[in-house]
A protein has these predicted regions:
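Hydrophobic ligand-binding cavity/cleft-lining segments
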Residues: 1-51, 147, 152-154
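Hydrophobic/aromatic beta-strand elements that line small-molecule binding cavities or substrate pockets
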Residues: 5-7, 33-34, 60-67, 90-99
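Glycine-rich portal/gate segments that line the openings of hydrophobic small-molecule binding cavities
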Residues: 38-81, 136
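A conserved amphipathic terminal alpha-helix motif
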Residues: 115-154
Length: 154
C-alpha cells in the first residue's frame, strides 16, 4: 500500500529538515506513538497504538533513518509486530523537501505492507486508516510551523 502526499509550511527548508530529523518532534506528529527510545544514532524503538476498523492494535516498532541528505531528503525504514498476535508491519518512507516562494514543500511517500491478521483486513480498510493518519500528521506539522506554533520561525 502506497500513501503519498505533500504539504507546504511557512518555514525555511533547513528549519523544517531539522524538525523532521528530530525524532521526538516527528513522533509527536503521529497519533498513537509512545515510549520512543533512541537505540543508536539512526535507530529508535517505540510503541504505536491505533484503531483499525473496529479493532485496537498496539505495535512494537523499530525505525531506522536509512539515508539522510540535509536539507533535502530523509529516508526511513519501519519494522514492527502487533502485540499479542501474529503479523508484521514493514514500511519504507521517503521525505523530500523543496523550497517554495512561501516556505518549504514537504513531499512524502510511504510504502507499507501488513501481513497476518492485519493484512487480511483488506486494502480499502487499511488505506482509509492510512489516509486518516496522514491527515492528522499533516495537520500537526502545519500547526507546528504556523505563527505561534512550536516550530514557527520569525
Amino acid at each position: 500500500m502506497v500513501v503519498e502526499g505533500e504539504i507546504t509550511v511557512a518555514a525555511p527548508r533547513e528549519a523544517v529538515f531539522r524538525s523532521l530529523s528530530d525524532a521526538p518532534f516527528f513522533a509527536s506528529c503521529i497519533d498513537g506513538v509512545r515510549d520512543l527510545k533512541q537505540i543508536d544514532a539512526t535507530r529508535y524503538d517505540a510503541m504505536l497504538e491505533t484503531r483499525i476498523a473496529y479493532m485496537r492494535f498496539t505495535f512494537r516498532v523499530t525505525v531506522e533513518m536509512s539515508a539522510v541528505s540535509p536539507p533535502e531528503t530523509i529516508e526511513a525504514k519501519v519494522e514492527g509486530t502487533p502485540v499479542g498476535m501474529v503479523g508484521r508491519l514493514t514500511a519504507s518512507a521517503t521525505t523530500r523537501l523543496s523550497e517554495t516562494g512561501h516556505g518549504t514543500n514537504i513531499h512524502y511517500a510511504i510504502n507499507a505492507t501488513l501481513t497476518g491478521k492485519l493484512g487480511s483486513m483488506g486494502q480499502p480498510v487499511l488505506k482509509a486508516k492510512a489516509r486518516e493518519m496522514e491527515k492528522q500528521f499533516s495537520e500537526r506539522i502545519a500547526a507546528a510551523f504556523a505563527p505561534g506554533g512550536a516550530r514557527a520561525t520569525a
